[in-house]
From Swiss-Prot:
It is found in: Cell membrane. This is Uncharacterized protein MG280 homolog. It comes from Mycoplasma pneumoniae (strain ATCC 29342 / M129 / Subtype 1). One of its GO terms (cellular component) is plasma membrane. The keyword Transmembrane applies. The keyword Protein transport does not apply. The chain crosses the membrane at residues 12-32, 217-237. Pfam families: MG280. InterPro entries: MG279/MG280. Keywords: Cell membrane, Membrane, Transmembrane, Transmembrane helix. It is a multi-pass membrane protein. It comes from the Bacteria.
């Protein structure tokens, strides 16, 4: 009974191991087969983030390199463009994260926990950036709505001479000679805007480039296929060789190559365990 249980347990473990490596081999094969789709999704996400960064950088560069007068409406319009890009980037990151979560069995072997953590941090940074941009837009909108010119109409033109580093150089009065109350509300804009750029740079540095992604993905998939396929092949070959090279006598299985020696050893073990049986056998042989 114990012999049967032992043999049954070994068979179950062998079959389970083969099934596990077969699944891993299938996942690796699927990863290679859908490589182009995975790369396209990643590239789209990366391009969206890069586009958002470029839009934000251009927005700041426009102010830094200009000595013209900008209207609140113009600023709001550009902020809305940047906000739109951030929302697109956030959506792309969420789609990428969703794809990973839907295929944990595959990507769990191809994407390290550190990279998944960086993806979460990148998404949080984008969400924080979006909140900041909305705050800036609301501040400017409130300032603009509260400003009236000499003729009682809204005056939205703000003489900004330069934004550089964390400083905004501005005129303290509008073209009509009245103090522009909106200036106070946007004095911190340069520092905040540069914070946005800094956040984007951190995001860009955390996310692998297109070339790096293809290298990581391909190496991970090939490694998964090679290791799982190799182990599975060894298990199958060893099982077949064991089956072809063995024969069963009673409840015991012996190797065809060394069956005589194995049977002799087995008989000796029985005789050593039961001395009276050995005496009976010897008496029978002497007759």
């Amino acid at each position: 009974m114990l012999l049967f249980i032992n043999r049954f347990a070994k068979t179950i473990i062998l079959l389970f191991g083969m099934l596990v490596f077969l699944v891993l081999l299938g996942l690796g094969g699927a990863a290679l087969y859908f490589k182009d789709n995975a790369a396209k999704l990643y590239i789209d996400t990366r391009k969206s983030i890069d586009s958002s960064f470029d839009s934000s950088q251009a927005f700041i560069d426009t102010y830094n390199g200009s000595s013209s007068k900008f209207s609140v409406e113009s600023i709001n319009k550009q902020i809305e463009e940047v906000k739109k890009k951030v929302e697109e980037s956030t959506k792309k990151l969420e789609e990428y994260e969703k794809q990973i979560n839907q295929a944990k069995g595959l990507n769990g072997y191809l994407v390290s926990p550190e990279k998944l953590k960086e993806l979460q941090e990148a998404k949080k940074s984008l969400q924080a950036t979006k909140s900041q941009i909305e705050k800036y837009a609301n501040t400017l909108k409130t300032a603009n709505n509260g400003k009236t010119g000499q003729n009682g109409t809204s005056s939205s033109t703000i003489p900004i001479t330069k934004i550089s580093g964390s400083t905004i150089s501005v005129s303290t009065r509008d073209t009509n000679g009245k103090t522009n109350s909106a200036l106070k509300d946007i004095q911190e804009f340069s520092t905040q805007a540069n914070d946005i750029i800094k956040q984007y740079k951190e995001i860009k540095n955390k996310i692998p480039t297109e070339k790096q992604f293809n290298e990581y993905y391909t190496i991970g998939a090939i490694t998964l296929v090679s290791v799982s396929g190799g182990v599975l092949a060894v298990l199958i070959v060893s099982t077949v060789m064991t089956f072809l090279g063995s024969k069963k006598l009673g409840l015991r299985t012996f190797s065809r190559l060394t069956s005589t020696d194995q049977i002799a050893d087995h008989v000796n073990d029985i005789l050593d365990r039961y001395p009276e049986l050995e005496d009976a056998v010897l008496e029978e042989l002497d007759q």
